[in-house]
Amino acid sequence: MNQYPRYSFTNDPLKPATIFLGDHQTPVWIQQRWEEGEYAGFIQKNGCGHCCVAMAARLQGVEIDPYEEFSLCCSMWGIPDLKQQYGYLSVAGIVKIMTHFGIPAVAKDTFRQGTQAAAQDICNALKEGKQVILVSNAKRYKDNPFSPGTHYILAVGYTEDGRILIANSTIRAKDLAVQFADYDMLEQALIADGGANPTLTWGEPAIQPENFGYVIVG
């Protein structure tokens, strides 16, 4: 039987919430408040995917933070060109990092199956006790509560009262750190032409849609 995710709030501006799932837990990091290390600027500007990977990994039992995760990416693929690659991850890059830790992960696109089928696939995965890292965008979703721009969020699972618990790393969200969603919200938030090109690692703006499907973890 799958366990329901729980959460609590803290007084730490960098980690204002903690999420609990079974025997594991993770802080919800706020990327704009990360200040440590030489890559802090990357994390502040484009660290949503790195925060999501670190949070999902911790819920799978791998102790890592966004800085350690970003450093691992740099050791595997080189330091990204901030003007060209921005330092954000493609969904294929997320899978490569999860695989490095021995965590099952599958990248999927939205453009072939459509956003309705993709949202249902995400909901089904959450019901199975998996987590999903997905790209949210305000283009299709007026007043998107997750972020006014393109942004990775982590869908943790269904709560006991039937809501989808979202871990959100940006101060630009309407509710800081912890949010709730349902099928309709996810369907509106998904990028309609999101891809899952398996050859990508860092995101490439020139082929941006190929970066932005979603990843099922676990």
Where are these regions (language model features)?
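Mid-length scaffold segments of soluble, non-membrane domains
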Residues: I79-K83, G87-F111
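Active-site-adjacent substructure of cysteine-protease-like catalytic cores
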Residues: G114-I171, D175
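Active-site-adjacent structural segments surrounding the nucleophilic cysteine of cysteine proteases
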Residues: M1-Y88
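Mixed-charge, low-complexity intrinsically disordered regions
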Residues: D12, V91, V217-G218
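Extracytoplasmic/secreted envelope proteins and their assembly/folding machinery
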Residues: G49-A57, V91, V95-M98, A119, ...
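Cysteine-dependent hydrolase recognition
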Residues: M55, L59-Q85, A107, A189-P209, ...
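Noncatalytic regulatory segments and standalone regulatory/sensor domains
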Residues: T18, K45, F146, Y158-G218
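Solvent-exposed, acidic/flexible segments
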Residues: G41-H50, G87, V91, T115, ...
